[in-house]
Amino acid sequence: MNLLIFGATGDTGRELVKQALAQGHTVTAFSRHADELTADFPTIKTIEGDVTDKATVEKAVQGQDAVLSALGSSSLKRSPALTTGVRNIVEAMEQYNVRRLVYQSSLGVGESRKQVGFLVRYIIIPLVLRNAIADHEDKERIIKQSNLDWVIVRPAGLTNGDHTGEYRSGETIDFGAKIARADVADFMLKQVTDDACLKKTPGVSY
C-alpha cells in the first residue's frame, strides 16, 4: 500500500516508517526535516514541508492509500499550527478521496480522562498538561467531524522499549500503564486494514 506518514522524524514516526517499510509498503514521509530519514531508510519517499502549508499537504496526500499521523509537540503551550495541520490533512484526504486516517492522540483526552488516576486527572492535567490535552481534543474533534474512515489511537505512557507485538487494546486502559512507541506503531499500522476499531478511539498499553 501507499502510506503517507506525518510526523515521520519523531520517535513514533520513525517506528512507523521502519515497520511500514519492513512490511513492504511504499512509504512517503512528510516532515519539516524529512531528509533526516534518507540515510537510515534509502527506499523512502520524502516530502519536506510544514503541515500548515495546505498546498504541500494536498500534494502529499494525492495517490495515497492511507495516512498515519504521529504529529506532536514537546511544548506545554498550545500548538494551533498542529491543529491547522490536522485540518489541512483531513480536508486534503476528503478532496482526493483517501479514506483511511490513523491518528495518534493520548490517553487522558476526551472521555478517556476518567481512566487516569486522581493526581493526573485533577492536578497534572489541569495544571501541567491542559494545553497539550486541549490541542489533542481540538484535533480529535476535526477528525471525528470528517467523513473519513478514521481510527484515533490513545496510547498509555510512552517508552522507548523494544517492539514486542504483544499489548492490550480497547476502550479501558489501566492508570499508570506503559507502552513502547514501537508497539504503538505496530498497532497503528494494523489499523490501516483492520476495520474493528473504525471510528473508535482505542487505548493501547501493556
Which residues fall in each region the model found?
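N-terminal Rossmann NAD(P)H-binding glycine-rich loop of SDR-like oxidoreductase domains
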Residues: 3-23
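N-terminal Rossmann-fold cofactor-binding loop
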Residues: 30-35, 50-51
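Conserved Rossmann-fold cofactor-binding substructure of NAD(P)-dependent oxidoreductases
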Residues: 42-64
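N-terminal Rossmann-like NAD(P) cofactor-binding module of classical short-chain dehydrogenase/reductase
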Residues: 61, 65-68, 102
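NAD(P)-cofactor binding segment of oxidoreductase domains
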Residues: 74-101, 138
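Glycine/proline-rich active-site loop of Rossmann-fold NAD(P)-dependent oxidoreductases
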Residues: 111, 162-165, 191-200
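Substrate-positioning beta->alpha
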Residues: 135, 153, 179-189, 200
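Conserved beta-loop-beta element that borders a ligand/cofactor-binding pocket
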Residues: 140-161
